[in-house]
From Swiss-Prot:
SMART domains: LeuA_dimer
EC number(s) reported in the record: 2.3.3.13
Disulphides: none
Record bears the keyword Chaperone: no
GO BP term, pick one: L-leucine biosynthetic process
Chain ranges passing through the membrane: none
Pfam families: HCS_D2, HMGL-like, LeuA_dimer
Family: Belongs to the alpha-IPM synthase/homocitrate synthase family. LeuA type 1 subfamily.
The protein, known as: 2-isopropylmalate synthase
Amino acid sequence: DGEQALQASLSVKEKLQIALCLEKSGVDIMEVGFPISSPGDFKSVQTISQKIKNSRVCSLARCIEKDIDVAGEAMSASNSFRIHIFLATSTLHMESKLRKNFNEIIDMAIFSVKRALRYTDDIEFSCEDASRTTIDNLCRIVEKLISCGVKTINIPDTVGYTIPNELSFIIKNLFEKVPNIHKSTISVHCHDDLGMAVGNSISAIQAGARQIEGTINGIGERAGNTALEEVIMAIKVREDILGVSTNINHKEIYRTSQIVSSICNMPIPSNKAIVGSNAFAHSSGIHQDGVLKNRENYEIIDPISIGLKKVKLNLTSRSGRAAVKHYMNEMGYKENDYNIDELYTDFLKLADKKGQVFDYDLEALAFINKQQDESEYFSLKFFSVQSISNNLSTASVTLLCGKKIYTEASTTSNGPVDAIYQALNRITHFPIVLQKFQLVAKGKGKDALGQVDILVEYKKRKFHGVGLATDIMESSAKAMVNVLNNIWKAKQVNKNLKNLKKQ
């Protein structure tokens, strides 16, 4: 379902990579494709069903014989699999889309279930647009489907129209009015058009649903689907209220989220619950002080529990002395190594100008007192890039290093940005490894600025760089020069500290 949000279909290899991540995460069932839709999807379902051993694979099919047969064929190599059939049951869909009455819908559903049972005894049936289906009709078809052998009844909020108490009412009515309801697992499949997919899913659990359908990062048609990582952690954190648990390996959540984001080329919003970059970040001085004293003061989830290493304290003008001391302590400095009052005063000045301050900035303030607006050691004077065939590029850069100017041309590189970075590296000889490159448009149209944010590793330390220009190559070059200056400042700190120790 999540693939419907993408501008381009995923390859078989990409889908398999995601499926293996889901298996490692411990998901019970994964719906891996709609094999009738294309030869590529058939191949994906076939390949994944052969590789996955610890999760049950599932294939989607309409109430059409050919769909069901192809779904069964695609998963025939798997030891155990599920066929998921769907058919609309709301009056609106029956009349305007299917042109059928409810009795005909029931007949189609029963025929399709019997067809699917030829391939597997694990059948799931979705009453499409169930949340807008009259409760009497829904109860009637659910009872007949269970009698036919359907093991999982799915209640989709197909257009994200329902609010939590409505979905809870539907689920409770099924348990009250369908006599054989306990022979089947009740599932819900919620969309996020009104921003209530997760809330609806939790409400359904409280009403008796025991399967939640969703996607990693909530990607999906229109506004998306239930974000699995949010439901999973809600169940874990509020098990005292919900009284249920999952088989998920929670420490795989963050890693899986990042992999899905990367493969699908869908960045995770910084304020995204559970997996956003700000989910465990603290900027307020009061909050930072509280977290340092006891994490539970301002965090209901331990970041380690989802695969993150530690809490993130953003150093901004809102940070207090406690956060500054914490960062200095993390870098191995004792309080008598620096003057906290002077450092904090300089820190606030820098934070007002720079926005976010990093650990190496604190070192520079404490030991060489170098402000961001002072002249930098490295300054980009000129650059040019030439792209040739087969995505290869060469670059030439002129860099001011202190008072000396150096010009260097890179050898053939894999792309223009890499060519620029190689040329800069030939001048500075800093053994850096690029770990993250992010481009964000600032504004609209041809004159929009492009901001490049990069993260590199240098001698086991992380350094950030930012570049802003209308030309992406220039933004990229400026970002790397920013990194080089940050590294240079850190090197100066080390020199000063060594000199102090000699004295």
